[in-house]
A protein has these predicted regions:
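Active-site lining segments that contact anionic ligands and/or coordinate catalytic metals
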Residues: 36-38, 95, 107
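C-terminal active-site "lid" helix and adjoining low-complexity regulatory extension at the edge
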Residues: 75, 89-90, 102-146
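Protein kinase-like catalytic core scaffold
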Residues: 24, 49-50, 96, 108-111
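Gly/Ser/Thr-rich helix-start
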Residues: 47, 98, 127
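A short glycine-rich, hydrophobically flanked beta-strand micro-motif that places a catalytic Asp/Glu
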Residues: 26-27, 93-104
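Phosphate-binding site of ATP-dependent enzymes
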Residues: 2-87
Length: 146
């Protein structure tokens, strides 16, 4: 890969690093579906509540719902559930949205979001994740007398 980088790209990257001090690089993962979409899996208290596809608008590659993506139901599979729950545990999240991509090698976690919107899963599946969050909070309240 480094051999395919142009000298002008290296110069540009150096300028960006000098100006900003930090650069995050991310491996490109080709979508197995051929269409620009990802999966948002909602995990509460170690359990997968449900998952949606976030489909990019026509002609776009960004599938974020706030940027015009459209939520559709995503079937729960053992692989999806296992990876989403393990990803949530890896960062110590009680409630999160785990973003995954379908690649030729299977599912890949790309992000664990600690403040995901529940609108997409509600719109696509009718699941209100706030109920599961409230149940978790209530079951973990300290019931000692003051």
């Amino acid at each position: 890969l480094l051999n395919s980088i142009e000298q002008s790209d290296i110069v540009s990257l150096r300028r960006i690093i000098e100006a900003n001090g930090l650069v995050y690089l991310q491996e490109f993962i080709a979508a197995a579906s051929g269409s620009p979409r990802d999966i948002r899996a909602f995990v509460v208290d170690g359990r997968l509540q449900g998952a949606i596809y976030r489909n990019a608008p026509p002609g776009e590659w960004i599938s974020n719902l706030a940027r015009g993506g459209r939520p559709t139901p995503c079937p729960k599979t053992r692989e999806l559930e296992d990876l989403a729950v393990r990803s949530a545990r890896a960062v110590g999240a009680i409630y999160c949205g785990v973003d995954l991509l379908e690649s030729k090698d299977g599912l890949t976690t790309i992000e664990v979001n600690g403040t995901p919107s529940g609108k997409g899963i509600y719109d696509a599946l009718g699941i209100d994740v706030t109920e599961a969050i409230a149940e978790h909070v209530c079951s973990n309240l300290d019931h000692r007398k003051a």
